């Protein structure tokens, strides 16, 4: 894993518009990127837990969140934006990979500036909160999403589909008695999404693979991840973006004292 500093991030994304789409994990991806643009410090646990706040690290809540009544339903909305003199990063919360709301986001791109980078994932809500045909619906919606992205976005936009990080069993799930559980659903969903993304020749980062040996960085709820994991996630994203643009990667060795050092060395250990 390459070693980016905050200064490297500001240089790489200079005068770029980056959009992150997805669920609460993707919100944390957005938050770590926003924080990394300003400092080398990691997110705090409290910052990771909060949602819908009016301001986070000099960003602003644009729509939804605490502007409205907070809830955990499928109609929840949250749009955030960080803007500096030379950087623009925006986040849209999704509860489904393709929907009428997603079309409204695409309309934003058509009427306003188009993103230079689009980072997206949606899986857990799709497979956990909708119909009994959730896997078939998910495949259909992935096809619709990727086709619409190619129709709406500029060919110069770097679209990065991230597979979902490894999920654990919920406290209410007894693995041996459960035909459908979150862990297995995520594995199936990742297989479908990677297959469809490849068919549409989109860039794909397999975050399930990258974090397969980092389960100690996952939170007790079996879904979310700690600040060290999210900084590693950001480093992987930035490495891919730089390579895609033909930009030389930063040189240097990660200090052994860095929390990321242990996480990065896990990537090179054989899976037991």
How would you name each of these model-derived features?
Residues 4-13:
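A short acidic-Thr-Gly-centered motif at the start of a beta-strand
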Residues 88, 92-272:
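Alpha-helical cap/lid subdomain in secreted, periplasmic
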Residues 17-136:
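Conserved SGNH/GDSL esterase-like catalytic core that processes O-acyl groups on lipids
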Residues 5, 65-68, 209-210:
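Intrinsically disordered, low-complexity segments enriched in polar/charged residues with Gly/Pro
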